[in-house]
């Protein structure tokens, strides 16, 4: 699986076991990602932070 790093078009190949790409952003600024990368389990959203997870190449 290939996931974008914080600044596309840069990306990396995920290590074994991390089969999701994710994008983390603040609820107040959804168009400005705070973090991007590979993850094993999609974290739960909170009141301030949301996560978008997906499992196809460079979908984050």
Curated annotation (Swiss-Prot):
The keyword Secreted applies. Keywords: Cardiotoxin, Cytolysis, Disulfide bond, Membrane, Secreted, Target cell membrane, Target membrane, Toxin. Expressed by the venom gland. GO terms for molecular function: toxin activity. Its main location: secreted. One of its GO terms (biological process) is killing of cells of another organism. It comes from the Eukaryota. Changing residue 55 to S: In minor component. InterPro entries: Cytotoxin_Cobra, Snake_3FTx, Snake_toxin-like_sf, Snake_toxin_con_site, Toxin_cobra-type. It is found in: Secreted; Target cell membrane. Disulfide bonds join 3-21, 14-38, 42-53, 54-59. Pfam families: Toxin_cobra-type. Shows cytolytic activity on many different cells by forming pore in lipid membranes. In vivo, increases heart rate or kills the animal by cardiac arrest. In addition, it binds to heparin with high affinity, interacts with Kv channel-interacting protein 1 (KCNIP1) in a calcium-independent manner, and binds to integrin alpha-V/beta-3 (ITGAV/ITGB3) with moderate affinity. Monomer in solution; Homodimer and oligomer in the presence of negatively charged lipids forming a pore with a size ranging between 20 and 30 Angstroms. Belongs to the three-finger toxin family. Short-chain subfamily. Type IA cytotoxin sub-subfamily. This is Cytotoxin 6. The lineage of its organism: Eukaryota, Metazoa, Chordata, Craniata, Vertebrata.
